[in-house]
């Protein structure tokens, strides 16, 4: 991959082995900051590799790390810290960030991964540079006070053909510092339906972060 370094490996988080893929600028080029990519129940870190998101991020100067969540992808043997659909302790994603030395990262969180990202987002003292929720679950499990306390800039993304995107937005719009990207004609995995629009919106958002 020209101009980009990539590798994959396994980290141990709270006693569980998690698979990850990492892509960063090549040839010792400086890194702006890190981006942690999560995924939905039917997907894995491979989704972001195949879509070209990892490469696009690295080419733009970011360290991009995509993990396979517990019980999914190549982390299938790892036990999840909470049942699917229930918020996991914020400490889980904090441990991922610490182990991979990402902090403070931008977190990209589609669908299922909301059970991990939202508790991390609202945890007191959480270190996050930015948050990109893509129609995540568990938005109804966070209260208004916690949403209002979040200072992290957010880019809320969803497809206009996705009912889950619309319903999650009704909660996420309580985040004080947010902008919205609605993709016309796109469904639940809107980044797959409109990859060019996804990459442009994401990179524009990242460019505006310190």
From Swiss-Prot:
Superkingdom, taxonomy of origin: Eukaryota
Top EC class, one word: transferase
Active site location: 111 (charge relay system), 162 (charge relay system), 188 (charge relay system)
EC number: 2.3.1.-
Family annotation (InterPro entries): AB_hydrolase_1 (IPR000073), AB_hydrolase_fold (IPR029058)
Subcellular location: Cytoplasm; Nucleus
Catalysed reactions, semicolon-separated: L-lysyl-[protein] + acetyl-CoA = N(6)-acetyl-L-lysyl-[protein] + CoA + H(+)
Residues bearing PTM Phosphoserine: 91
Any single Gene Ontology cellular-component annotation: cytoplasm
Family: Belongs to the AB hydrolase superfamily. ABHD14 family.
Quaternary assembly: May interact with TAF1.
PANTHER family in alphabetical order: PROTEIN ABHD14B-LIKE, PROTEIN-LYSINE DEACYLASE ABHD14B-RELATED
Summary of the function given for this chain in its UniProt record: Acts as an atypical protein-lysine deacetylase in vitro. Catalyzes the deacetylation of lysine residues using CoA as substrate, generating acetyl-CoA and the free amine of protein-lysine residues. Additional experiments are however required to confirm the protein-lysine deacetylase activity in vivo. Has hydrolase activity towards various surrogate p-nitrophenyl (pNp) substrates, such as pNp-butyrate, pNp-acetate and pNp-octanoate in vitro, with a strong preference for pNp-acetate. May activate transcription.
Protein name per its UniProtKB record: Putative protein-lysine deacylase ABHD14B
Native source organism of the sequence: Mus musculus
UniProt gene name: Abhd14b
């Amino acid at each position: 991959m020209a101009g980009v370094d990539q590798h994959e490996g396994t980290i141990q988080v709270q006693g569980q082995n998690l698979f990850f893929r990492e892509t960063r600028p090549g040839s010792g080029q400086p890194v702006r900051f890190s981006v942690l990519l999560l995924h939905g129940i039917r997907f894995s870190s491979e989704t972001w590799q195949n879509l070209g998101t990892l490469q696009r991020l690295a080419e733009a100067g970011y360290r991009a790390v995509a993990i396979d969540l517990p019980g999914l992808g190549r982390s299938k043997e790892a036990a999840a810290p909470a049942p699917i659909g229930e918020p996991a302790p914020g400490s889980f994603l904090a441990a991922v960030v610490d182990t991979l030395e990402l902090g403070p990262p931008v977190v990209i969180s589609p669908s299922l991964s909301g059970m991990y990202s939202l508790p991390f987002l609202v945890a007191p003292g959480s270190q996050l540079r930015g948050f990109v929720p893509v129609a995540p679950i568990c938005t109804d499990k966070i209260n208004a006070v916690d949403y209002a306390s979040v200072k992290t800039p957010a880019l809320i993304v969803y497809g206009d053909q996705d009912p889950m995107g619309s319903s999650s937005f009704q909660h996420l719009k309580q985040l004080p510092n947010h902008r919205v990207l609605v993709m016309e004609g796109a469904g639940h995995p809107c980044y797959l339906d409109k990859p060019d629009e996804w990459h442009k919106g994401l990179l524009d958002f990242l460019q505006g972060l310190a």
